[in-house]
């Protein structure tokens, strides 16, 4: 029998997974990725990479012992992992459209897009932090054996990196939309699917906790990554929706000023 937990998991994974396709399809149909900020897609790809590693470790490398309660394990499912892996791969595809649209996708235009220097520094800083955290994690496990508390600390740090990327990545996209003063070629369908997935993800977590250990500061700390990602996604997607209502009546000529 399918439970409410499974239904919510299917809804959020399906919604978030499908939301990856409108940008790619829209860019392909219009032969341009001008509506997508390069800073956004670069930061998003890095963030998804951190998230995939974090969820993989928590799902498949969690050491079950008699001394530690399974209640301390973050409430993650197979849905979370496969959604994130799929999202990471789709972001790589979107990245090829933005970075190499003319060469790979045969988009017209010869312009070369570059990252904003500030966002490039942020990306490089996050990669440096990720490298340091990973070296420290591997060193500790090599000398002091594998321990769940150490794994959780490392995974939460990766979640923090992902949340940081999510907080920052939307800013250049919001700015990009504002600069163009147009939502032409912007995949608003993906935004609505994102909102649906974010709400379903939060409802699933609430349902899981209400049937398990209940709500407390400890459970929030343990699951703050999932809560944080859902809230950030919802907040910025509502901003995109407001921009869409403001700019949707603008003409298509403004968007043409920003070719690939």
From Swiss-Prot:
The lineage of its organism: Eukaryota, Fungi, Dikarya, Ascomycota, Saccharomycotina. The chain crosses the membrane at residues 7-28, 40-62, 81-102, 118-138, 151-175, 185-205, 227-247. Belongs to the cystinosin family. It comes from the Eukaryota. The gene is ERS1. One of its GO terms (biological process) is L-cystine transport. Cystine/H(+) symporter that mediates export of cystine, the oxidized dimer of cysteine, from vacuoles/endodomes. This is Cystine transporter. It catalyses: L-cystine(out) + H(+)(out) = L-cystine(in) + H(+)(in). Its main location: membrane. Residues 1-67, 162-212 form the PQ-loop domain. It holds the Pfam family PQ-loop. SMART domains: CTNS (SM00679). Keywords: Endosome, Glycoprotein, Membrane, Repeat, Symport, Transmembrane, Transmembrane helix, Transport, Vacuole.
């Amino acid at each position: 029998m399918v439970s409410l937990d499974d239904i919510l998991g299917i809804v959020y994974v399906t919604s978030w997974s499908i939301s990856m396709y409108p940008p790619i399809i829209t860019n392909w149909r219009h032969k341009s990725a001008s509506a997508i900020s390069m800073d956004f897609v670069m930061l998003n790809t890095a963030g998804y990479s951190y998230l995939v590693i974090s969820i993989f470790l928590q799902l498949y490398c969690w050491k079950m012992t008699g001394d530690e309660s399974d209640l301390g394990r973050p409430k993650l499912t197979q849905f979370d992992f496969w959604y994130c892996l799929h999202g990471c791969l789709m972001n790589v595809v979107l990245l090829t459209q933005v970075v190499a649209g003319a060469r790979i996708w045969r988009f017209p235009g010869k312009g070369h897009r570059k990252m904003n220097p500030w966002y490039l520094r942020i990306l490089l800083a996050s990669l440096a932090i990720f490298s340091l955290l990973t070296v420290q994690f591997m060193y500790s496990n090599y000398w002091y054996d594998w321990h769940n508390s150490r794994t959780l600390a490392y995974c939460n740090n990766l979640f923090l990196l992902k949340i940081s990327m999510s907080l920052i990545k939307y800013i250049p996209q919001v700015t990009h939309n504002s600069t163009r003063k147009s939502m032409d070629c912007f995949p608003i369908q993906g935004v609505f699917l994102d909102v649906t997935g974010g709400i379903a993800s939060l409802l699933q977590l609430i349902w899981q906790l209400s049937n398990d250990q209940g709500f407390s500061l400890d459970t929030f700390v343990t699951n703050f990554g999932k809560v944080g990602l859902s809230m950030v996604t919802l907040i910025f997607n509502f901003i995109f929706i407001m921009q869409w209502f403001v700019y949707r009546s603008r003409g298509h000529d403004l968007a043409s000023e920003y070719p690939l």
